[in-house]
Amino acid sequence: MSNVTHQPKIGFVSLGCPKNLVDSERILTELRTEGYDVVPHYDDADMVIVNTCGFIDSAVQESLEAIGEALNENGKVIVTGCLGAKEDQIREVHPKVLEITGPHSYEQVLQHVHHYVPKPKHNPFLSLVPEQGVKLTPRHYAYLKISEGCNHRCTFCIIPSMRGDLVSRPIGDVLSEAKRLVDAGVKEILVISQDTSAYGVDVKHRTGFHNGEPMKTSMVSLCEQLSKLGVWTRLHYVYPYPHVDDVIPLMAEGKILPYLDIPLQHASPRILKLMKRPGSVDRQLARIKQWREICPELTLRSTFIVGFPGETEEDFQMLLDFLKEARLDRVGCFKYSPVEGAGANELPDQVPEEVKEERWNRFMQLQQQISAERLQEKVGREILVIVDEVDEEGAIGRSMADAPEIDGAVYLNGETNVKPGDIVRVKVENADEYDLWGSRV
């Protein structure tokens, strides 16, 4: 055990998705509350915590490299997060790691920190910890995690083996956190989980309470309540359950942002079956048409995988045909990558890397054309934009159709009389495949 006499300092690195970022924020909030100083450099820290990602092989490699860097520069390292669920894999590469915990093991992480770097007796930081906790996002937006884990067993994914089955947070707790965020100046709440539309399924949508008011534990009920906070609410990771239809009217009424992040993964019924995903493409196209009729402003984001084991040229052509018909606004595409422990590894007919690359290029070329056409439709229109950055050359923001980090931006060249978090009306003057340019009205 270290004999720490100065103010203890903890180095911290957070890797992976927004869900992991929320876990990091929770750990950092506890550390700050207990009086630890969190520092950006490893060399003068008493210990380093690495919150890892283990979703795909490249993420595993990045996590292992970050652990190695922390060991080289500091020597005392605790590992947590998704890759922490595979302790043997970490120990094989980095046997000198002090402790390893799995994802959302907040208490264990803190116990290990206390063991190696005891808590300070005097806490000069307690009054500096904001009520909403430590946030790693800009002040004007924040991620709101509503559940942990997932009940699906998609064959390309190992999240359930790392994070377990679905566990929904009590709706009262979620809404209390959202209220604290808004009170602290947050203008945009990004609702996240492994499976947002499954919120409440594990507790059979039981009645919860917030400020003494009863409400159902469900995605639709949660959206209704969040809409009362008067800020932008954006839904991510929405599995295409039938009840997703029920949130579209809320978007049409302006209660939550007309934005749906709904990972569809493929469009060939045969490949979807191999993935253990919903397989009715015609039904999905009909739903998209219906959603747009109800809410013409709706932005649809999705992600797809090309080169999944067994994918033929015919299967891939079905995917391209789907893109042409669905005309989705925002699309991400991944080349299938084997993940240790995933069921898809056992499937026959693995697709050669050069074929994956060729299909990915064709996919992206088509979707870029669709995206450019969709954005061109906005030229000449007025839209609302939330400002993210301002410098001497102007401002950069996002429209209601743009989530942070993953979507496009709106450039306001020469506009310096705004600040991050401002929501301004903008006339769109130009567009390319991903971004817009405009002037404040």
UniProtKB/Swiss-Prot annotation:
PROSITE patterns: MTTASE_N, MTTASE_RADICAL, RADICAL_SAM, TRAM. [4Fe-4S] cluster 2 binds at residues 150, 154, 157. GO terms for cellular component: cytosol. Its EC number is 2.8.4.4. It catalyses: L-aspartate(89)-[ribosomal protein uS12]-hydrogen + (sulfur carrier)-SH + AH2 + 2 S-adenosyl-L-methionine = 3-methylsulfanyl-L-aspartate(89)-[ribosomal protein uS12]-hydrogen + (sulfur carrier)-H + 5'-deoxyadenosine + L-methionine + A + S-adenosyl-L-homocysteine + 2 H(+). Residues 8-118 form the MTTase N-terminal domain. GO terms for biological process: tRNA modification. Residues 136-373 form the Radical SAM core domain. Belongs to the methylthiotransferase family. RimO subfamily. This is Ribosomal protein uS12 methylthiotransferase RimO. It comes from Salmonella typhi. The lineage of its organism: Bacteria, Pseudomonadati, Pseudomonadota, Gammaproteobacteria, Enterobacterales.
